[in-house]
């Protein structure tokens, strides 16, 4: 147990010391566990009292340590490989973060205008320091892990086919010396054809956030490297630097040689790349130069040097020079196949506004912006355009009232109210109104106004009549034309001025000037004389609505409610002291209840008073009933109102009856007496062929008389009792009465009811002709039972 515990603690301590990412908390926890174990071993429980036991324990401890060392070496190799892979992964992440930080710094440097340029002596051309480039290439080679296809964060070149051995940086070899790590190096040419190199340097190794990384913890995990390898690597970098410097010395000669050819060349210039292209090193470049198309470049000493210089510049992330674009395009294999050009976003234009809110340019001039036309198709805009296009003229008076000499300004006439159009009120149109108006206009235009009215009346009558015959269409007589009231002539002197003027004429008054000599001063007073009111010639107003006729039950209910309301009002007035309260109704039955002790003092006197009061009350009741009782004249008037209509009504109804035979005296008496009792006018004309009865009167009387003629009198039974039946009458169907026509007229034609017995039809017709209603006889003659 002790050996296993010791080997476990020893292995934990060794792993903790070898691991680069152990935390202080974990170290402190393990240290506390180790102290606890040591205290436990030093306690009395683990202390051995024998010397032999302690020696055995030492032997076991040595054996355990030996085995743990062997196991630790095996496990250490695996741990080192694991840590190596983790560091390589962290290095790739760090390179990516550096590349992102480099891009951000480039953008910030381009935005702020802070460019770091390196100048060279001589012709004033700008050249980059190749020492920095060599150190940058050396750092790149040192950071790329063995066998990995990581991406170089500085130049953006993918190293797919190349493999590099992992070596430590120069900072680990010489810790006292601070090394400048090149984050980015971009070459451009200005308008003076000088090369400009923008570089951003960060001293030492830095993390993604710019803080320096400590290499103390990683030194134990890195493998030991030989100093000869470092020297070889440095020599290689210096050789590469010298070769690149020699090859780029020929760039000015190349520029001078390309000027005459580029000016006379028909080829167009290739626009320079604005950003660093991402070029793959695995891309194949053509090593052979085409024989054709290089006529102007015979003076170039070393074409291969130019090709290799451009290739190295592309690998290190340099921009292509825009003046060498025609030369570079002549090498078909030199352009990278996987070229991606990412344009930088242009800066948005600056909006400048003056104090009034108008847009101005950098010199302060107001920029005229064309106002966009209104393309909206809303109903509001359409109506506005129509209103602007069609100007509505306001109404104007035809003649100015102030120019009229007879216009009185004191009348207070407002011209605005006259010109203001009347607002149309909401009116319902009856069905068929417009059709009737159109027909009336058609008749008026075709027949004239008078003829159109006659046709309208006839059509209305024809609509109410039967299909066979329409008695209303029969012309009664010529219509009496209405007499129009003649207009009064305009007098020479108005009646209100005749009493005031001296001579009663306007002749002496000229130009409207009136003096006291023209007037009767005594007639003038301080009173205002108003003219007599004249009613306008308008139709009479329609009669007011008639009250609703109630049933007997409803009338009783209303009477009870009125009596209760009256009694309640009386009690309220008595309560307020406005009326004297009535005396108590004392009877013999309630004598003791009402009077109490007073009834026992003088019973005889009290009884006499009670009987006298009861007799008075009874007499008052009788008098009230007698006062309410109708007189004989009132009873007769009431009966007349019940039997007959109001005599003031103008309407008169006419009924024409046709009777087959009216020879029986009983039926003749009924016909005559009922007509007179019902106050009907008319006549009864009897002939051998038929009899005609015409009655005129009010609606109630005509209704009762119609029941008599059509229902109450049995015409067939009356003829049988007479005993003068013939076989012809039985064949014809017996005696009968028909209502030929019933209608209303404006004025009655008869003054009383007469009975006429005529021998011939001409005599009977003459009776109706004298009354002016010969058409009644024609109606009866032409009437058929069918």
Swiss-Prot record:
Statement: the UniProt record of this protein carries the keyword Repressor: no
- Segments of skewed composition (Low complexity): 165-176, 268-283
Q: Does the keyword Nucleus apply?
A: yes
Any Pfam family matching the protein: Prp3_C
CDD domains per record: Prp3_C
InterPro entries reported for this sequence: Pre-mRNA_splic_Prp3_dom, Prp3, Prp3_C
Q: Where is the composition biased (Polar residues)?
A: 145-164, 177-189
Basic and acidic residues bias: start-end ranges: 1-80, 87-112, 123-143, 190-203
Q: Where is the composition biased (Pro residues)?
A: 534-547
Report the source organism.
Arabidopsis thaliana
Query: Which compartments does it reside in?
Result: Nucleus, Nucleoplasm
Region span, Disordered? 1-223, 255-283, 532-557, 616-642
Q: What happens when the gene is disrupted?
A: Embryonic lethality when homozygous.
* UniProt keyword terms in alphabetical order: mRNA processing, mRNA splicing, Nucleus
Question: Where is it predominantly found?
Answer: nucleus
A Gene Ontology biological process term = embryo development ending in seed dormancy
Name used for this protein in its record = Protein RDM16
Superkingdom: Eukaryota
Taxonomically, what lineage is the organism? Eukaryota, Viridiplantae, Streptophyta, Embryophyta, Tracheophyta
